[in-house]
Structures are given as C-alpha cells and as structure tokens.
C-alpha cells in the first residue's frame, strides 16, 4: 500500500516459467521469455495504457467521454508468456482512443495444476469440480478489477472487450463460458 500517486512505468515480474536459454530457434528468439525479465510467484499485475489521462498529479485531466476498454490475455500454451511481451504492447491501440489492460496470470503447475488428489477432494465435496484452474481465476480477478476500477483511468466499465491469442484465445472462451463472469464484460475477441 502507498499514499498518493504511484508512477508505475516498469512491468512487474512475470509468472514462473521455463526460459529458452541461448536458443537461436525462431520462436524462442522472437517470442521466448527474455531471461532478463524477472520471474516470481508474486506475478499478478495489470498493465494499463490509457489516452484519457494527461500528465500526472495535479496536472492530470480525465477525458469527459468514457472510452472503450480492451482487456488482453496473453498466450503461451499456459506454460510461458507474459504481459511484458513487446509484440503485445498496448500503446498503439490506446493511441486510437481505447483503454488497454493486459492481465497477468499464473502458468504451469502454479496456474493449472492437475493431480488425482484434487479429483478425490472434489468427489468428497460432492461437487465434482477440482479447484486447480488458478490461472483462469487470476484472469477473472483481473477482469473484475478492471470492471470495478477502469473508470478512474477514463474507461467505460460497461464497454469492456476481453481478447486473447493462442492460450489467451482459449482463456477468453473459458471466461465467456463461466457463469461467475456474468456482467463483467460485454464483448470478446478470440485470436489464434
């Protein structure tokens, strides 16, 4: 917690994931996780690009018209990736009058654990649902935060589009299908 304005210009740590090392493979070179990017279990951050705010502190001014909001969910086979990827920087979309938010979520076993004991616990509870899709819940928490707070960044909480690519595309489908998300967003774009 802090008081006043927090000027957050750097990406937070990304989720724990394998790195390609010194690979010269095209995919690793172009989209692989940069070993210089810090990784941590403390990885649940949002990045916001908004054309609505001008300046900082006392000089800041919010546009009077609420802007549409786009929430980005990155891909990477639920194993790698993050909000830091230069290919998915929200600067250009925001320059066109859209508030862009990228949502971080846990990956690999931290986000999508599967184990026979989880199934057994679900059977014992009687609901048949193993609670291990933490990555999807992280995404949902990010979308909910956007819904509750995006107006402070000039965005319209009633005009939210969730979009993603690859595993982010499948995540968008999961978010669409979840009854927990009723009313959190209005539109979706699935890219692969």
Regions found by a protein language model. Give the residues of each.
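Conserved hydrophobic residues forming the short capping helix/wall of the S-adenosyl-L-methionine
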Residues: 108, 150-151
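Short, well-ordered amphipathic alpha-helical segments that serve as non-catalytic structural scaffolds
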Residues: 139-147
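Alpha/beta-hydrolase fold nucleophile elbow
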Residues: 68, 133-134, 146, 153-166
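Active-site loop->helix "elbow" adjoining a glycine-rich segment at hydrolase catalytic centers
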Residues: 75, 134-138, 166-169
């Amino acid at each position: 917690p802090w008081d006043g304005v927090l000027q957050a210009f750097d990406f937070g740590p990304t989720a724990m994931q394998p790195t390609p090392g010194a690979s010269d493979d095209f995919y690793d070179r172009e989209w692989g996780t940069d070993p210089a990017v810090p990784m941590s279990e403390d990885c649940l951050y949002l990045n916001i690009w908004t054309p609505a705010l001008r300046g900082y502190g006392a000089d800041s001014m919010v546009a009077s018209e609420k802007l549409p909001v786009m929430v980005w969910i990155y891909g990477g086979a639920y194993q790698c990736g993050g909000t830091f990827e230069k290919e998915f920087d929200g600067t250009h979309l925001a320059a066109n009058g859209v508030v862009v938010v990228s949502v971080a979520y846990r990956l690999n076993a931290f986000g999508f654990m599967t184990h026979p004991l989880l199934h057994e616990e679900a059977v014992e509870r009687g609901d048949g649902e193993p609670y291990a899709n933490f990555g999807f819940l992280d995404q949902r928490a990010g979308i909910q935060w956007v819904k509750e707070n995006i107006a402070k960044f000039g965005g319209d909480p009633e005009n939210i589009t969730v979009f993603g690519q690859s595993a982010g595309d499948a995540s968008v489908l999961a978010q669409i299908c979840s009854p927990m998300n009723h009313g959190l967003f209005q539109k979706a774009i699935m890219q692969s």
